[in-house]
């Protein structure tokens, strides 16, 4: 992130506190090259405050000014200037505000900050060739935040804004939302996200809605096999018969039952119980399939009855939400090539790289 310090910050640093403020601001920006410092006005070199800085800081500023004379750019992510505290929307700050803003970790807001972190770590590790994102995450400069589901993202960000006196300019974050579609033509999530996406636009917050149902749907086939093992081999065998697109929208943990209503589930349970009472050895048929939305039934029409039965109730691994995502961190079964194979058919076949580059551009 490019941070420009205006000449006014140097000229106004006349007392001891302001001088310390300037020195601390420079330290935050320059420490371990976290941010890219920009100072265009060579006149700062003649200010009293510049002369009181550490020699290493003075040398750095002189080099920056010399380089900017050769290759000047007016594109900045953050501007620090006297009177910047009057701004509430644009990324313009006073020196005191800039310290608060730049000390914040960059927040990647997830629907489940703990479990989804494994997916994001894989994206950073495998789709950022610079290594910056993984480095920033290790340093604590990128933080995963738990929004508590998509319905709470707006409240989460509103609370963050209030922490900074109601100024939205203090938001430093990127929101990643599950696609939540049950099948490709499912419009319910689009309606659900419409208001949130509009508000994120107003707040100038970057976001991405996954093309697949959720992060679990990006798991490569090799990783699925490893997780299922021999215990859930029948489920895995059935899963492998699905097309790439069908895998995108399956609820892996809950199966198809999550796509019918509570009352429909009760009816299904009653029918299943009656069948088992009549003949425990009779081959069971799916009662769930007929209750799915017609578009979803059509989408999975190619799935045989036997395979549908295996997939119907999901992959019932104990502590699924904890254990399953951990496989994104297993480099033996989860790597760049097989993650790319899971997105090659999408509208954006490089979706994971798109996510990584969007965050990289902001930090």
Task: Indicate where each model-derived feature is located.
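C-terminal structured domain segments
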Residues: 41-43, 47, 270-346
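Intrinsically disordered, low-complexity basic segments at termini and long loops, enriched
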Residues: 40, 54, 343, 351-352
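N-terminal extension/subdomain marker
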Residues: 1-88
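Activity-critical C-terminal alpha-helical subdomain
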Residues: 191-310
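Conserved small-residue
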Residues: 1-10, 346-358, 362
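Short, charged N-terminal helix-start/capping segments
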Residues: 26-43, 86-106, 352, 361-363
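RecA-like P-loop NTPase motor core
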Residues: 65-181
């Amino acid at each position: 992130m490019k941070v420009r310090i205006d000449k006014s910050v140097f000229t106004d640093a006349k007392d001891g506190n302001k001088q310390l403020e300037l020195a601390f601001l420079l330290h935050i920006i320059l420490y371990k090259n976290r941010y890219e410092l920009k100072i265009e006005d060579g006149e700062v070199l003649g200010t009293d405050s510049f002369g009181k800085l550490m020699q290493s800081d003075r040398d750095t500023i002189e080099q920056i000014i010399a380089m900017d004379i050769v290759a000047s750019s007016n594109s900045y992510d953050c501007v620090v200037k006297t009177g910047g505290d009057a701004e509430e929307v644009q990324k313009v700050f006073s020196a005191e505000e800039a310290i608060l803003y730049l000390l914040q970790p960059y927040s990647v807001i997830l629907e489940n900050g703990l479990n989804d972190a494994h997916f994001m770590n894989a994206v950073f590790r495998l789709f950022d060739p610079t290594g910056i994102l993984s480095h920033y995450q290790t340093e604590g400069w990128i933080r995963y935040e738990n929004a508590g589901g998509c319905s709470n993202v707006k409240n989460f960000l509103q609370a963050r804004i209030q922490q900074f006196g109601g100024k939205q300019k203090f938001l430093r974050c990127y929101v990643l939302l599950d696609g939540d579609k049950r099948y490709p033509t499912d419009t319910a999530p689009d309606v659900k996200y419409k208001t949130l996406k509009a508000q994120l636009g107003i707040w100038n917050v970057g976001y991405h809605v996954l093309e697949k149902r959720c992060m679990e749907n990006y798991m490569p086939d090799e990783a699925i096999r490893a997780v299922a093992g021999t215990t859930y081999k029948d489920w895995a065998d059935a899963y492998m018969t699905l097309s790439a697109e069908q895998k995108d929208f399956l609820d892996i943990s809950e199966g198809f039952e999550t796509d019918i209503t509570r009352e429909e589930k009760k009816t299904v349970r009653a029918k299943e119980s009656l069948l088992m009472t009549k003949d425990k050895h009779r081959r069971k048929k799916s009662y769930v399939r007929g209750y799915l939305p017609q578009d979803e039934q059509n989408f999975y029409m190619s799935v045989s009855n036997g395979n549908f039965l295996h997939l119907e109730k999901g992959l019932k691994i104990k502590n699924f939400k904890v254990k399953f995502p951990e496989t994104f961190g297993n480099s033996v079964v989860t790597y760049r090539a097989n993650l790319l194979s899971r997105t090659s058919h999408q509208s954006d076949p490089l979706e994971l790289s798109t996510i990584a580059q969007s965050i990289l551009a902001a930090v």
